[in-house]
């Protein structure tokens, strides 16, 4: 687990040297699990220079369409997966996406540039 922590810290630091870091409410929710107080999370976000963005309606619409494709591909979930909101937001905003879990993003959002730790694919 520490390997991923170090990778994440390193890539966020490197990427932020030349790019603005953005998260949306879905990522905010996922990250909040690691904090005891909202103030701690807000401080961390501020220190990292991360901007929190609303998910555009175009991305919400795309999320629904991708979810339908997922269901047609024998997906079993009853509502859109968090990664679908994240991938759709990256798609409509032309953002790069830093992630360790590339499978769903490659399948449903092939146009998004993924930044990931899989050295065999670099």
Predicted regions and their residues:
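Residue-level signal for well-ordered alpha-helical positions
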Residues: 34, 66, 108-112
């Amino acid at each position: 687990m520490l390997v991923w922590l170090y990778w994440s810290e390193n890539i966020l630091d490197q990427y932020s040297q030349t790019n603005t870091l953005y998260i949306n409410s879905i990522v905010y929710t996922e990250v909040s699990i690691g904090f005891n107080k909202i103030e701690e999370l807000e401080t961390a976000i501020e220190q990292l220079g991360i901007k929190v963005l609303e998910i555009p309606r175009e991305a919400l619409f795309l999320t629904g369409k991708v979810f339908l494709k997922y269901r047609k591909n024998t997906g079993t979930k009853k509502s859109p997966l968090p990664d679908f909101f994240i991938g759709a937001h990256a798609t409509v905003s032309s953002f790069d996406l830093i992630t360790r879990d590339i499978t769903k993003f490659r399948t449903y959002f092939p146009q998004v540039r993924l930044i990931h730790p899989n050295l065999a694919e670099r």
